[in-house]
Amino acid sequence: MGIRSYRPYTPGTREASVSDFAEITKTEPEKSLTTYKHSRQGRNNRGVITSRHRGGGHKRLYRIVDFRRDKHNIPAKVAAIEYDPNRNARIALLFYKDGEKRYILAPAGITVGTMVVSGENAPFEVGNALPLARIPLGTDVHNIELTPGKGGQMVRAAGGSAQVVAKEGDYVTLRLPSKEVRMVRKECYATIGRVGNVEDRNIKLGKAGRTRHLGQRPHVRGSVMNPVDHPHGGGEGRAPIGRSGPVTPWGKPALGAKTRNKKKQSSKLIVRRRTR
């Protein structure tokens, strides 16, 4: 992909940029692989806001993406590379030899006509899914399972990749994009290569309207609120927090405080915690 920058014709286009969508080969989604997903606007089943700063945005059709890659030993041809409004990565439409169609995350470098396959004996090529035990050290992988057969849960964002750094016993050690080093069962599947749309991180939205179009609402600072609304609020003018450290609207430590449950069973699989 490439990025197209705007000239400062208006304040909204100054410093703004957009993807050129050069890799997109099909504009309409596959109807059999789409479904309508009602926007929750950050509310739970009682209508209470549980995730702030969400709402509005353009309506979306959800694309059913195959994260399991459980159609083993059946080759598939990449029929199209498509845009997916539900994620920053592109998706690839696969036509399997037996006639089935599926979407997968489009790896970087994959093109229309490429053949991909999943399985224990799949060739070592970009887009193929194999158990971690079969993947050589130093390989970049994405869409990684945490539980065998559950489907990929890690490294699915645009441009993301993890690296296989060690193998010992029943576990394979991975270095994740967050710099966390973690062990995963060797039976878990992962896809060779990194996720496509690598330049997405360099796109600048340029104005508030584009952010609202994505379904994100304003993120108001607590220091400009009233004391009734936030622990940071109140005071005359630009007042300091008035506490030993920043907190959330509900009084919990924020901005750097570790929130992971120390009793979580999977903590023993983390060799080195993430740095940020």
From Swiss-Prot:
Keywords: Ribonucleoprotein, Ribosomal protein, RNA-binding, rRNA-binding. GO terms for biological process: translation. SUPFAM superfamilies: Nucleic acid-binding proteins (SSF50249), Translation proteins SH3-like domain (SSF50104). Gene3D superfamilies: 2.30.30.30, Nucleic acid-binding proteins, Ribosomal protein L2, domain 3. Residues 29-55, 219-276 are annotated as: Disordered. The keyword Cell cycle does not apply. This is Large ribosomal subunit protein uL2. It comes from Rippkaea orientalis (strain PCC 8801 / RF-1) (Cyanothece sp. (strain PCC 8801)). The gene is rplB.
